[in-house]
Amino acid sequence: MGPRLHLITNGVFTTSIAGGDIHFLKLAEGAARAGYQVNLFGGHALREVVAQHQLPATVTLTDEDRMARVDQGALSGQVAMFRDFYGRFRRTLQLLPSIAPEDYAYAVSDYWFDVLPVVRSRAQRRLMVLHMEAPSFAQIVTRGRPDVDPKRLASLHYWASQEYSLRRFCAATRAQGQPVRRHLFYLHPLMEPRLQRLGLAPAERTLLSYGLEVGPTEAVPAQERIYDAVWIGRVHRQKGIEDLLATLQFLAARLSGFRVMMIGNVREAMLPLLAGRGLEKHLEFSGFVSEEEKIRLFKASRCFLMPSRHEGSPRVIGESLIAETPVVAYEIPNYRPLFGDFVRYAPPFDLRAFQQAAQTEIQRMRSGENYLRKMDLARFKMENRWETTQEKFLQALKGLGNGAG
């Protein structure tokens, strides 16, 4: 039997999983296929997710039941979530003797409830991932970054957790008197200077892609482009909702038969914002859709609008690109290192420039001109497909010693 790989996944509290959850599930899937014995520490919600995805892995339960639904924006809800995370963290510490020195331990987030159990374990082969840079303390105080919550509590927790967890992971060099082998994955090139300052050598870190479903996307047939624009995301100021709606108004006034598809369960949150804008007849809401249907809707659209004010490594841009749907976005710092010239950029946050760029791309697509057909999408797909991401993960495991296969 192959080596044991433990994933510490205490942040999963619902079966509605997000990008980071998909990331660790895909990595675990690749490790299991390569012969590793995969075990996940987490709660009852995680166990349901593992079953839904048919992941060949065991689950070591760290809670007694799923957390009841709470309002995550309210102070009471944030306190309830912290208590829930702490409960799973405490139970994980009690179960750490089940991790042997020769095992691998991987923290699937940069939060304390995943990283500290890895640091405190007996495992001499340790891994963690940095998905996104937390806002700085100054950005939190001034709300200088759009993803800082109004109460600032969640953002302070994120900042403090990431700072402490990274430093603890990088400072832990021995376990039970034996040297520790460590490896850190990061999802954006701009994170490299920070990791260098923390003392991580190039051989101790790997840049991983956010991962794309290239095969399933190519399996969906080409569609008639019946929607001029498509949008997917949360209804949050970080996503540039006001600029999105202003752009839709701008386009509806200038393009005959203008149609927009909004993917996801956003109708209820969007409707109050649409009042008085005259957009109702131009919009369609998909509601919750399968992965295959999401791909089909991208392929049925002429342009993906991305007016976000801040993002980390947004997989959704890559999803649009491999569906050969042009992307118009503000040129915020994180985009070009990941997507280069595959995106049509507008200066941040020049609304008129964004609107004009969107109009130009839609008109070109209406006339049959798609700039992506002239670009090396094959290379982009190869670099960002899940298989490549899984291969890099396995290489890091083998580099720590006793690799399967």
Residue map of PLM features:
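A conserved mid-protein helix/loop that constitutes part of the nucleotide-sugar donor-binding site
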Residues: I22, K26, H236-F250
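Short hydrophobic beta-strand element within catalytic cores of glycosyltransferases
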Residues: P326-A329
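Conserved acidic donor-binding segment of nucleotide-sugar-dependent glycosyltransferases
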Residues: V343-A353, E361-R366
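Membrane-proximal helix-turn-helix segments that form the acceptor-binding/catalytic region
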Residues: S136, V148-L184
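Short alpha-helical donor nucleotide-sugar binding micro-motif in glycosyltransferases
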Residues: F288-V289, R296-S301
